[in-house]
Amino acid sequence: MKLNRQKILDFFKKSQSKASVILSDKAKASNTIKDALGKAVTNKGDLEGVWSKLLLLFAVSKDYVNGDYTEIPKRSIIAILGGLVYFLSPIDVIPDFVPVLGFVDDIYILNLVYRQVVKDLEKYKVWKDAQIKFIGNIDGSTAS
């Protein structure tokens, strides 16, 4: 099956517009991330090829929405959230209920988003690793 990339990208642009609106409401943004994570966990086998990327997209979007990490351009967060909105939509270019092929377009979009924001994600990973180290040092020093 050949992907209609233009149709997928047009649908993704609509998802990004929705994401921009969702991002202005912290509760909606949090729920969108939570719902997308739930769908991802349920369909982990179909998403194996993008699983680690997807977890990183969830983490940075959650930390951004919670106000823990804001050193990422808003356009990057909108792209990430747009990818999650696209992923959440059961009726997109290839409906998710279509056996075997249902997630092909979702994986295409998630990979596209990842490539678009990879530099921002690398900075986020450095920050996140520092946070984990810092917390580990606090835990280690209080245990002594």
What residues fall within each predicted segment?
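Terminal, membrane-proximal amphipathic helices
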Residues: 1-77, 115-144
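Alpha-helical transmembrane segments that serve as single-pass membrane anchors or pore-forming helices
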Residues: 75-118, 124
